[in-house]
Amino acid sequence: MKVAVLGAAGGIGQALALLLKLQLPAGTDLALYDIAPVTPGVAVDVSHIPTAVNVKGFSGEDPTPALEGADVVLISAGVARKPGMDRSDLFNINAGIVRGLIEKVAITCPKACVGIITNPVNTTVAIAAEVLKKAGVYDKRKLFGVTTLDVLRSETFVAELKGLNVSRTSVPVIGGHSGVTILPLLSQVQYAKWNEDEIEPLAKRIQNAGTEVVNAKAGGGSATLSMAQAAARFARSLVKGLSGETVVECTYVEGDGKYARFFSQPVRLGKEGVEEILPIGPLSNFEQQALENMLPTLRADIELGEKFING
């Protein structure tokens, strides 16, 4: 099994490289790529950690050597948010970066499962899909927007608020990966009783948690460490699924189009990537209303990505 990280010298990428070196199954090959010349050094650095994960680093304009034979590709390349920016401000730079990398994936490892971390995820996943489609290699079971950080944040905040064991707290998060499109299904959390006045502030905190980090870092970056852990968790789940285990994660995928072309919801992962898209389950009145309210935003984000490739 080979996992490639594109954007491995960045804030998310370096932390992700460390976590994958520690957490991937023994015998996995880990390829780290970034345009930055420091990348082979990042690989040497993490290679000194005593785990049975084999690491190689690649830098320069062409990611092809890192992608050869990859089963899983994680893309975190791009610019990060700064105070005053929202995820859509990143679009102009990151859209082109994702397009270029996916063009290489389409040629070098078209059957790989691809996890998009680069924001704005609502849009960059649509870009990736259209590039793969133009190349004639698109398989919707193998393209994912990594929305796991919304799940991690929800689990953390719910457990804190309700005094629950965080390791046993599970919160499905549906929709997209920015602002109002992030919808934590708090009504489905086991052992949590909610007052009406708790739900909206908590949902808003989860939606705006990325901005909370950007502001707290005072211009020094965005959520890199928690995002790296979220991406590592998702990568581990993908690897387990590809190895034949049954794993369920919330992730942003192309499904039946009931709500939008791409939509984050619980997905059963398996040997082909997406094995089954699971139902979102019963919603509270608040959640139903929030879902209806977000859909125009989500659909517009997706359309932006499609138009970027197709004009």
Curated annotation (Swiss-Prot):
Substrate binds at R81, R87, N119, R153. The keyword Transport does not apply. NCBIfam families: MDH_euk_gproteo (TIGR01772). The gene is mdh. It comes from Haemophilus influenzae (strain 86-028NP). One of its GO terms (biological process) is tricarboxylic acid cycle. Belongs to the LDH/MDH superfamily. MDH type 1 family. Catalyzes the reversible oxidation of malate to oxaloacetate. This is Malate dehydrogenase. NAD(+) binds at G7, A8, A9, G10, G11, I12, G13, D34, N94, I117, T118, N119, M227. Its EC number is 1.1.1.37. InterPro entries: L-lactate/malate_DH, Lactate/malate_DH_C, Lactate/malate_DH_N, Lactate_DH/Glyco_Ohase_4_C, Malate_DH_AS, Malate_DH_type1, Malate_DH_type1_bac, NAD(P)-bd_dom_sf. The active site is at H177 (proton acceptor). GO terms for cellular component: cytoplasm. Homodimer. It catalyses: (S)-malate + NAD(+) = oxaloacetate + NADH + H(+). The lineage of its organism: Bacteria, Pseudomonadati, Pseudomonadota, Gammaproteobacteria, Pasteurellales. Keywords: NAD, Oxidoreductase, Tricarboxylic acid cycle. One of its GO terms (molecular function) is L-malate dehydrogenase (NAD+) activity. It is an enzyme of class 1 (oxidoreductase).
